[in-house]
């Protein structure tokens, strides 16, 4: 067997091992942003430890530093991304090849990136990074974050390993959405589950919603804000109890969009 063939075999074997470990499981998104009241490296690591204690099958984490620290503390498969915000583009999830390289070098098992039709800072549709990344880091597993069926179809054809409607509710076309698109996701699963690992991510706030996603064909489910962001959990309660006068979804969306860049070395330890 040639060296290239061996590498391909190793990737397929590693890929299957990782995906098997995530199958039918909960992936907890453990992320902190500079505007979060709980913003500290210590907190994000403890979130990941708590997720493992609770039975999570994997972790989704943001930024090389946070990925690195979580990998030191928790031995679960890790989906890594790098949120980089731009004043001229809505693409912020691992928007460049360099960002993807940093995620990979930090120890992520899977690289997540925006694969929507949104235009990136370079003036290209975000999804065009996918084939570039597959060529430049061929051993990496790639999680394509999309917002609709057509985007999912495209990334499956381009060879994404994992696909999820992560950005449903975060694009200009879907920004006012409050509920998961279970019907659209079910269609994705019916059409693409034999070609990619289908992950339900986005607007899952209860265990019952997660079970629905599995029933509809999800291979795994990602939950973030409903588990790991106490200020947003509180905001949802106060909004609902206050007669829906204070839009909790808007607060959630604004908490991750268009934040000013900040150096990770400025992150407090506790």
Annotate each predicted stretch with a short phrase.
Residues 178-179, 185, 227-254, 259-264, ...:
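C-terminal helical cap(s) of enzyme catalytic domains, especially alpha/beta-barrels
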Residues 3-101, 105, 150-157:
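Conserved N-terminal beta1-alpha1 strand-loop-helix module at the mouth
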Residues 198-204, 222-226:
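Glycine-rich beta-strand-to-loop/alpha-helix junction loops that act as flexible
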């Amino acid at each position: 067997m040639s060296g290239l063939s061996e590498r391909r075999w190793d990737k397929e074997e590693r890929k299957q091992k990782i995906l098997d470990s995530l199958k039918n499981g909960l992936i907890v998104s453990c992320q902190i942003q500079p505007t979060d009241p709980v913003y500290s490296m210590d907190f994000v690591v403890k979130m990941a430890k708590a997720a493992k204690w609770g039975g999570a099958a994997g972790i989704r984490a943001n930024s090389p530093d946070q990925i690195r620290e979580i990998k030191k503390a928790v031995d679960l498969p890790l989906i890594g991304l790098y949120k980089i915000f731009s004043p001229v583009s809505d693409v912020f999830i691992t928007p460049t090849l360099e960002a993807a390289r940093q995620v990979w070098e930090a120890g992520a098992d899977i690289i997540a990136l925006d694969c929507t039709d949104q235009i990136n800072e370079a003036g290209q549709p975000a999804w065009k990074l996918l084939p570039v990344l597959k060529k430049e880091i061929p051993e990496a597993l790639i999680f394509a974050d999309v917002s609709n069926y057509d985007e999912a179809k495209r990334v499956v054809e381009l060879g994404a390993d994992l696909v999820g409607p992560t950005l449903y509710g975060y694009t200009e076309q879907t920004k006012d959405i409050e509920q998961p698109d279970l019907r659209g996701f079910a269609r994705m699963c019916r059409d693409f589950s034999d070609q990619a690992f289908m992950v339900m991510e986005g607007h899952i706030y209860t265990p019952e919603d997660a079970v629905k996603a599995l029933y509809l064909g999800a291979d795994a489910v990602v939950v973030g804000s409903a588990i790991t962001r106490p200020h947003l959990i509180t905001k949802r309660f106060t909004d609902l109890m206050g007669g829906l006068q204070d839009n909790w979804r808007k607060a959630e969306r604004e908490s991750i969009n268009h934040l000013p860049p900040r150096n990770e070395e400025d992150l407090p330890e506790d």
